[in-house]
Amino acid sequence: MARRLLTLLGLLAAAVASPVLWQKDCAKGPEVWCQSLRTASQCGAVKHCQQNVWSKPAVNSIPCDLCKELVTVVGKVLKDNGTEDEIRSYLEKRCEFLPDQGLASECKEIVDSYLPVIMDMIKEEFDKPEVVCSALSLCQSLQKHLAAMKLQKQLQSNKIPELDFSELTSPFMANVPLLLYPQDKPKQKSKATEDVCQDCIRLVTDVQEAVRTNATFVKSLVAHAKEECDRLGPGMSDMCKSYISEYSDLAIQMMMHMKDQQPKDICAMVGFCPSVKSVPLQTLVPAQVVHEVKMETVEKATVQEKTFSVCEICETMVKEVTGLLESNKTEEEIVHEMEVVCYLLPASVKDQCKDFIEVYGQALIDMLLEATNPEAVCVMLKCCAANKPPQQPVVVKPAGGFCDICKMIVAYADKELEKNATTTEIEALLEKVCHFLPESVSDQCVQFVEQYEPVVVQLLAEMMDPTFVCTKLGVCGAAKKPLLGEDACVWGPGYWCKNMETAAQCNAVDHCRRHVWN
């Protein structure tokens, strides 16, 4: 169902894994250098591509957005003084999620070979993750995308568009005289009586003749135009060649349309000769055009964005997790897949979806693992209203109903607190955590904190794993007794507040004074 993030690094592997370039290939310029990070590295042009090609605006797409999220995470790790080994471990771990072993191996090879280059780019372009993703071929150039769409639109219709010749002829038409009349050959000067119109007609006539008789004329014209780009200097030269590479096909199409038309009519269209009458470039036939009404309907439909409630997000996650459990996925893989689902939802609910996973994710997985009816999970989590009784009996969880709320609190603590948090920080979080959970479970949260606060503080200082902490407390699991091992302090307030000695033993004197002895 949702496998796009798992294929992200696979796309990266396929995009960067290009054949080794020979020196003659590198001599072809930026068009070859900037195809991928591998080609740029082989041609020693990483900095050039980073500054002049990959920094251009990119098209929004799912692979591009996911890549930018991944690069942002790595950037934050670098900002927090994360080591290269930590980042390598993180990326290689993501490579292991790829379903295809070949792509997984290729992904790891790319990480091993180009990680220093990628890290340097992330440090330099921390606020522009799209630059790194363009280098990895996961973000597409907006300029190329628009040019391709424009060309594709023309190819899908045989309608002759109204072309702006003043825009399309430069710089190709500007180089036609140089190609037809080389400067090293002396030419007779035009007579003073010859006007611009006659010059245009002669030029168009020569171009038409060259197109008809010389099969290589068009290609040589494009090559000559690229050579002329070198006259513009280092900064503009590459941009000029890039422009020619993108728009040369369109210019060639224009020339092919010109070859069967009257030169005077063409010169009249571009304003060099007086217009006698309106003459089309060629005989028009019915065009394959989509009706405007139909196009408006489609555009309006795509703008509308579905809104999602917490209940709908929960039901979506239950359906996803149920399918993953049937596929024997590990809990780590399931959580990863749940995060992928958030990226496939509208942007307006992406953060809400992530918060849902942080608070309810582990509890949802545990309930489904314990054979809870999927239709009842969201109702039991108080995310959906109980409109109708479940069709199948629900397996009621033991331990007084504190298991789910315990896991929510521990998951929240794990998210908000740093590693090695002090007991003071943990106590401060427990005092306010109930205000951040859904109102439907706030009373149960307060009861839980009042009863288990001291031992929860001790366990969270040891480990912030929801399953470990809540099982250790005895509120989760199938144990008949809430006691695990011989530690009497996990028995709860009934033991802590028995007397001052037991309260001191379990570090619960303040708790007993506030809630029991007063």
Curated annotation (Swiss-Prot):
Q: What does this protein do?
A: The lysosomal degradation of sphingolipids takes place by the sequential action of specific hydrolases. Some of these enzymes require specific low-molecular mass, non-enzymatic proteins: the sphingolipids activator proteins (coproteins). Saposin-A and saposin-C stimulate the hydrolysis of glucosylceramide by beta-glucosylceramidase (EC 3.2.1.45) and galactosylceramide by beta-galactosylceramidase (EC 3.2.1.46). Saposin-C apparently acts by combining with the enzyme and acidic lipid to form an activated complex, rather than by solubilizing the substrate.
The answer to whether keyword Membrane applies is no
Q: Which lineage is the organism of this entry classified under, starting from the top rank?
A: Eukaryota, Metazoa, Chordata, Craniata, Vertebrata
In the UniProt record, the gene name given for this protein reads PSAP
The Saposin A-type domain extends over 19-59, 482-518
Q: What is this protein called?
A: Prosaposin
Which compartments does it reside in? Lysosome
The organism sits in which domain of life? Eukaryota
Domain Saposin B-type, by residue range, is: 60-143, 193-277, 307-388, 399-480
Subunit comment? Saposin-B is a homodimer.
* Transmembrane intervals: none
Protein's organism = Gallus gallus (Chicken)
